[in-house]
Amino acid sequence: MKLGDLEFHILNDGTFRLDGGAMFGVIPRPMWSRVAPPDERNRIVMAMNSLLIRTGGKTILVETGAGDKWDDKRRDIYAFEGQPRLPEQLAARGVRPEDVDIVVNTHLHFDHCGWNTRRVDGRAVPMFPNARYVVQRRELEHAHNPSERDHASY
């Protein structure tokens, strides 16, 4: 989609599953389960989308999905599904990791910043080596010191 000198692409990094009750909180299950049917473990399907923006010679990526650094236990818990993954979707649009100028994370939950890094020789290194990463200061502080209630999201 184009809007003036802005070009937008919605990229999908697949889906994962989370507990429906945790997602909908005080909304009764009979209400939310009509629009988001849970599986046998009470998990609902959640999509992971990123937004690629090109403007003024800059390439901006908003959110980076869940990434690929998951152990078997968490793969089972979250039931990640879907192809192609974010790197392949970027490549299909002619974008290499080193072409990304800015990565914006609205917050740092695992399903929003997973591709911020990739593993090289057992170490996490920036996936987008030339990018400036942008996140709210308070969110960064909270991610480093999460509460008991939300520590699993980081």
Give residue spans per PLM region:
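Metal-dependent catalytic neighborhoods of phosphoester/phosphodiester hydrolases
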Residues: 113-123
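Catalytic metal-binding/acid-base residues of hydrolase active sites
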Residues: 67, 109, 139
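Surface-exposed, flexible loop/turn segments at secondary-structure boundaries
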Residues: 16, 111, 141
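Short glycine-/acidic-enriched loop or helix-start segments at secondary-structure transitions
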Residues: 20, 71-72, 114-115, 144-145
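Active-site flanking residues adjacent to catalytic metal/cofactor-binding acidic residues
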Residues: 62, 106, 135-136
